[in-house]
Structure formats: C-alpha cells, structure tokens
Amino acid sequence: MSAHPDDLFWQQILNMDPTELLSDDVISSTCDENTAAGTDIMQPLCVDMSVQPTTSGCHTGAMMSDSYFSNDTPDQNCQSHSTLTDLSPEDMNNQINVQPNQMTFQPISPPIQDQNYGYSNNMINPIKPASIIKLHGHSIGEMTVTDPSSHVNAQHFVQQSNPKFFLNMYPCMTANSQGPGECQSVHNQSSGSGSNSYDINTAPRDEWIFTTSGGESWVLKRNTPNPPNSRTNLIFNNAQPIFHTQPQVSGFSDCSYQGGGLNSREYVNLAGYTPVCNMQNIKNSWATQLGASIDCMTASPTGIDANVNSAFQPVGVVSNNRGANVSMGGMGNYIENNSPWNQYYKSEMANNSINVKESNVYGHVGCVNDAISDKQGGTANVPSSLLNPDHQDWMRMTGTNTHMLNNINTNTEMENYDFPENDGNVHGATGVDLSTLSNGQQHSAFEGNGTFPVVNTGNPRTTLNCAPQLFLLGGNPTIAHPMNGNNETPDKNVCKPTPSTGVIKKLNFDGVDRGGGIGNFPKLASFVAMREKMSNTVNPSCGTFLEQLEGLRQQNSFEKNISFADLHFSEEDDVLSSASSVSCNSNCDMKIEVSQQGITVSNLQQGFRQQMNMNSSVVKMDGSYKTQEMSNGCATDVTDNAGTIQQNKRIHSQNENPEDGQVREGGCSDVRNEPPRKSARIHNMKSEGVTCGMCMTAADSTRQDASGGSSSGTKNEYYDDESELTGLSDTDSDNEVQCCQEVTKVGPKTYSSENFNPEYRQAKRLLADIPYRRWIPDPVNMEDNDGPFIPIVTRPATVCMNGRRRRTFFRQCVTAFGPLSKLTYFKELLQSYVSKNNNSYLSISWPPKHGVYVMSEKKLGYEHIPTLKDKFPLPCGWMMVLGVVGAEPPAALNKNMVILLCENRWVLLHNYSNSTHELFLAASDLKQFMEEGLSRCDPIYEESTVPYGVAMENSLRDFLRNSRTFQDLMDQRDNMHGCNWTFNGMPGRLGDRVIHLCNPESVDSIPGDEAVVCEGRPLYFFAYVTTFKSNPATKATVLIAADKDLRIYGYHKGRPRIRYLCKNVKTFFKAGARKFYLDFQITPKRLLAVNEEEYLNTLQNAPCLLLKPSVFRNIYSQEGK
C-alpha cells in the first residue's frame, strides 16, 4: 500500500527550511500518492488533447480555445490594467499580493473509466478525479465535449472541431520565472516508481513552455506583471460570463446539462472593469488569498469528483471565485479552488438523477475586511477573529477530510453587509429554457426534479441563469451559503478563510503592523492544532502534522529546526499545558487524561490518532440522493430530496461508568430538520463514561443535577439554594445544542455536571480571549488614578459569560426597547408609554434571562425620588420610574431595584433594600442601556438567578458550600491552598483571568492576617487574581481578602489601594474584581472628595463595560495597547 498522502504532504513541507519555505523565490513541489507513479496522460475517447496559447492580447493568463466572441465583446472590454488609479475603493478592498510570475499545477490524477471509486476518510485510497491546469488562479483552458446527443437542448449545440481537455498534470508545484530563457527544474518527491523531472522554460512574449518527462510540451501564457511602485500589488481581472440564448450561435461550445435548461456559455478572463451587461457579472476575487505560492501546501485532498461511466455527458458548470470558471465536460473534472471563500461541489447528472460521490460544502459565508497583504513589507495582516475557537468546525457532509488550515475561521457581523437571506442553492429543472423566464421565475424554476447546487453568491432576485454568480455585497467579496436545503436559512456567522503563507514572512493577527505574532507556518500550524485539541476536534491532517513535527524535532539537529516550542504563548498560559489530553475512542466516548506535568506532543497526537472511522455511501434515488455518514455507534444521516437536508443525530450510544459499573443507555430521536447550530459542532467533553457530547450539554446536565437527576425537574436551572450550587456556569448558556436525549436514572448516580471536564470549560473561556492577547498584559497605574474609573482594558462581551449568545440577548433587547427608544425624549411621552405598557416585560442584554417590568410610580408606590436628589449628586431636571428589575417570567419581581430615567437621558438603578439607598449609573442613555444591561450594577450580582462567571466544578462547588462562615473560609483556604479556577467569565478587566486560593502563611508576597485594615475592619487574605495560571503571587493583579463579616475586598500593593467589592464569597464569583477598577456606584454627597460638578463630569465620561469586538479593537488599537 502506498504511503499516506497526508504523510507525504507534510514530510515534504517539513523537510524544507522555514526561511526557504517562506521565501519569495521558493520552488516547492508537493504531490500526493496519485501522482507518484508517473503514469502517462490518459486521453479519453473522442477527446483531442492539445493546448494552444492565448491569442487575444486582452486575456491575462487564461488559455482559451479557438472560439470567437459575438458582438465584439472582447474589443469593447479589453483594456490594460497598468496602474491602480482606475480601481475604485471597492475594487481595492480585500485584495492582497500574489506573485505575478507563478504557475501552479494541481496534483490530481485522472479517474479510470467505467470504475466507481469509494471514499474513505483516511484518504488511503482516495478517489482520483481529473486534473486541470491553473495559472495564477485562473483556468488555463476549457473543457468541452464532442457528442451533441448528450445534451438536453441538442438543437443549441454547435460542435467544435478541436475540443480541449487538460488531464493528469503530474506535479503540484509553484515556480517563479526570473527572466526570459531561464530554466528551472522541479522534482516530484512523492513515493512511487521514482522521481520525475519537469522542465519549465520561459519563452518569448512571456509564455511558459512546460515539458513533461514524456517530451510533450505545453505552451502557457503568463500573467502581466503587477503595477510597479504600489504598496499593495494588484492583478485585477474580471471573469466575464458570456451567455448565449439564441438557438443558433456559431463558434461556441454548448455546455448544457441534464436536469436544467442551461444553454451554451463560455467564460473569458478580461482585464480591467467588467462591462455593464444584462447579466450578473462574475467578480474575480482570486487575489483574496494570502499568497498563491503556497497553494500546494493547502491542497491536501479535500474533495472527490464525480465519475461518468461510458458516455461523455456534460455535468454542469463549476466555478471558483478567482476566475477559474470552467464548464464541466462529460469527464469528471476537478476545480481546485483555494480561495478564502470557497466551496466545492462535484456531481454527475444523468437521466434526471444525481450521483454524488462527494459534497464538500463546509464553506460558510463571511467577509474578512482586513486581509490585505503588504508585498514590500512581507506581512500578511489577518483579523484576530480568524482564531475564534467557538467556530472551529463547520457543517461537514459525507466524511469530508478537512485539512488543518481550513479549520481557521472567523465570526463576522454579516448583518453589516446586507447579505441576502437565501438558501444558497441553485436548482435545476428539466427542460426549462431559462432565457424565457423572468428573474423571479428563474429562481423558482430551479426547484425541479434533480437538484444541482452550485456556488451562488447572488441575490435570488437577480438573474441567476443557473450559473455561479459572484457579487460584491457591502463592498466585500462574499460567497454563498452552504447547501442547507431549499427553505432553510443557513448560519451566516461563520466564514472559512484558508490563509496561505507563500510569500508571507510573518502573520500579524488583528490586522495591525506590530512586532508580535506568529512568525512562520509551523507556529501557525502548531497553534491551530493546539486550539483544535482543546476544542475536541478530531482532525486527521493535524494529527499527521504533529507526528511529523515531533519526528522532525527528534531527528533533525540543524540550527533552524522547527520545534513545537516555537509556539509563543503556550509557555505562559499553562491552561493550555495543564488541561486534559483529549482523545476519542472507537465508541465515540470522550476520554480525559489529565497530565500535571504538562502536555507534550505525544499527548496531543493521541487526540488525533484515535479518529472516528467514517464511511460514505451514495445511493441513487428518483431525482434525489442520499448520503449516509457512519461514525461507529454514532450516526449522522444526511438526506437530500429536492434540496432539503435532514440531519438525524446519534441514534444510540452506550457507555460504562467506571465508578458504579452501570451501563447507561440513551436514545436520540429526530429533533429537527434544520442545519445544526454552530455550537452543535463542538462535542462537549465528558469524563467518567458519559455518552457522546452531541446528545447532552452542560445545561442539560446542570438542570438534571438541580432536579435530583430527573430530566423533568421543575427547579430553575440557575437556582441555587442551601443544598445545591448548580448550573450557574458561564458555559451552561453558551452550549446551544438542543437536548436530544432523555436521561434515565440508573442506580445511585445519574448524569450530572460533575461528569464534565472542568478544565476543558476553563480552557474554552481562556481560548475565547486569544484574539485579545495583545491587550491582556495591561498595566494598571495606581499612582496616577484614584477616582472611580481606572483606565483598563475591559473584557469584550464575547469573552464574558453567555458571550456566544449575547447577540441573541441583544437582539431581544433591541426588539423590546425599540418602541421606547424611538420616542422623543419628553417626560410626558415616556410616562404615557409606561402607563400604556404597564406590567410588560422588556428583555435586557445582560444578565441573561432578566429584564425590566414596566411599572409606574403610582402602581409601584415609589416615593424616593426627592430622597435621592437630596442624598446623591444628580443632574438637574426631572426623574421618572421606568420599572423594576426581575428575572424572565414567570418570576417574582424584585421591587427593591427600580430603573429610573433622568432628563439628561441617564439610566439609573436604585436599590433600597435593608433601609439603605444605593444608586448606580446603569447607562448614559437608553441605547447604551440596551448594550450594557445591568452589568454595572452591583446588586444584580447578589441575585440567585444571575449565573456565576466561573466554570462550575466539584472543587469550586465544595469551596462555595463550605465558605458560608468566616471560620469555614479560613479552613478552606488552608485545605485548598493552590487551587485555581478560570476567572474571566464576568464583565470586568481583561487581564483578570485566573483566581488562586492561598494561605498567606505559605506565600511571602501576600500580607498576613490583620496586617491590612479597612475602615477599622482587619482583613484576611485568601486568594489572588492573575492573568495566567502560571503566574506567581508576585505577579498578582489584585489580592482578595475578607473581613469577619465575609465582606470581600480588593487590595493592590503598588500604591496601597483597598476597595470594597461585594458582600460575600458567592457574589464575588459572579461579580469578580470589576468594582476595584470601575465603580459605577454614585457616591453620596457627604462622602464626595470633589465638588459635585466635577464628579458629575466624571460620571458622564464613564467608560463602557461590554464592548463589541469591533468596538473593542477600534478603541484600544487607537490607544496603542
């Protein structure tokens, strides 16, 4: 058996010096096992293999046939592109440099006729599709057929005399031409029957002459050089589709396909702007990849093609968004499209049915605004959102083998781009002449017998013509949704950029030219591998890479050895080094192996070595297809009938609990016919023999724990009483997977939250702030700041608890407060709104499942406004009651917390429990209140319905249960000295991430008992807060202490600063140390150290707490953090 293609791929990459690998003049050659044998080029029946150079001067880098263009279209649109001045800002957006003199050949062998290939996820014997030649991201030639009888609309067919096919180009390589006449030789290093040498020469007029080992020459046209002296080099070509709707059009090949009324078409690459036509233009955005010279690196087998048995029937049109728009002929053809916005679809349409061999449709929609390469500076600026760990895996069908770099993805605010809500499909209807239909009729006509999805990024209201449409929406190139069915709304929040590092010397995250970042490809690969390990994502390519990486580290001794230790941040944040090693055994059980000494490469390999064996089978049905993906005991059935995808998860699983020896069973039923929600892609890790994570979530578990093990318990999932500290973890609401399994109580134990791996949850919370790591070591200058607001970097909302659901909460809040916020801000109008909407519930964005119950002063019996004006410094003008705070109905109202509106638009929270008055600045206006919620208000954290900001686990639960008295707390700090938990799940400072329990007697840098006194109360220190788990107490940001009444204080040693934080330990684990830096409580007049006007100005400029990621980066990047 031949070597594993992934092994060969990575071996060739790892055998190269990093500097050579990332140099501009690199000549890399990587091929899979299919090209190793060096077989002769297969020539199908009735196909004449020949290549002719481009004859038209306006074509840049595309090989065309001997056809001509009707209506003189090229003459009207052929224009040179020598400068950047002709480009509009939209055209320049999202473009990066690609070497102008590179030619890339893709490593795919031709299929064998009359033989169907099976697909296995390990890619030992992958299907062998046909090849095409791609020059600088463009189609080198066209594929046509010669049998007119194979077309549905045969009367439109005009046979060409000399059709072209490009098949079986052996090597996968990228070559740079230094000048005319220079010869370069690239060798195939794959295993097989020896190496083959291929010579590349530059001929006059910048043509390429490619000579195979058999002596056959291919003449290829090279791209025009990039415009000189430009910071961002651009080659801007537009792929212009030319449609022919007349019955008789001479000189063109007809590429209709069965099952759809597609008439003849041909794609031409034209320089300059795309002309205004009556058709939807196809925008060529191939330049949005991060370098073309690394195409071979990222071209591991990710898809397989359809096969045609004996008849050469056309199967449709496949296009990429870099200009490689090729009409698929009868032979199975493969279009390798390595663009950041990409999806493959290969199928055969014959006899009005679809025979699908592979549907690699995992590419979601997205836009990357800042992915712009600086050729001269050698830096690729990558948005930090590429590393969002919440979206590490997208919907996969039929066992797609997704390689490593494809697992870098982004979370994008798609609503900012007005992306159309469509299903992303184009469907074919038999015998329909699209030219006779209107736009809307064309789209509906595609819902026919036999579904043929293709890449579609146009609005369904545009002229689709059953062809790939690329369109700039919101000024950014986008691609369509994955094929999720006819009527489903796909997930728009994820895109799948595939960055390459061909000419890039450095990857700079967050899109700013800074010195930090990951310096070369192996570091990026190592990071992705670690992140995927922590997210429990099984990825064969990553596992192979880690094996090769470890082997290289042990075997090679040269100076520039690629080492796993090159990963910069893993050495500091030992959450990544002390967390559990994850593996997935044959029964799809999540196995946890905790290593106190840290994670090694061999530990990481285990998570990828034990992979789920997936088998795919394809069954022809009447006008539909059915693809089944099996993962041993856990199965996913994907059925598509007229474009509807139905997913049925996890039919059965059994596991044995090592503690009680009982076998637990749980069946899964079909719960929905919609695409899996994005969090469903993450397997929730469980230890102690818990069943597959797709069937049960943390929220399910904690609800069962709260109800005594019964899935039908009535106790609130956030409720904590004297006996239980239950599901108040930040991850409970983050997991959006619907419960698809009814838990059966077996023996004395049931599924509970203690079965979940806490270190995985903590690591998830820490990994969420990886894009913000440059701001984490944020120094706090206590010397210059003594007011209520110390300048710090606040934690973005996406990192806080319920961060992944915050968009949902915010949307609900905007909907609820919309009518109120649109009112003219007059007291009479506001009072009228309150009286008309009395007792109505207005959702707020934070905390989750809380809101404001609208209630008038008279209804509430509230008479404290004069008291507040007398005791507190408040702006002049009227004040009125909006309502009271309460949890999601049905719930008891907390009439002691009242929301007030001021004439200057302030939103205040008045808490008057226990005969004391506390006033908090909730927001500066209603708009800010919708975004911030009650995150600034201290009393809300004392409510039992507010979740903790720390991942709940057994040790933390025991600590909270046994710290209800002062003496218990002192005992716990001795017994649990050294315990630490992730602390960054609540609003507050970004750098406060881990809390450590400690005994001051064992730590020299922490003051002893009663050494510090606050307001006559001696303090007893029991914990400290750091940024990383590995930080000692000497690097603590805040020391945590308690008095004998269990009131919690924060203490900073630099300039001794003591701040009261909260009233007990449980509240501290919900509120954190935010009040130490940002205190939104309004100080009474009698305690003011400054005059009222100055204090009110300070409140007016109070910083926001829950920032959106885009706002966060905009604010702190400008400050140079």
Swiss-Prot record:
The keyword Oxidoreductase does not apply. Transmembrane segments: none annotated. It comes from Human herpesvirus 6A (strain Uganda-1102) (HHV-6 variant A). Keywords: Glycoprotein. Glycans are attached at N188, N325, N351, N449, N561, N615, N838, N911, N914, N980. Residues 179-198, 649-684, 701-734 are annotated as: Disordered. The keyword Electron transport does not apply. Belongs to the herpesviridae US22 family. It comes from the Viruses. Residues 701-715 have a biased composition (Polar residues). This is Uncharacterized protein U95.
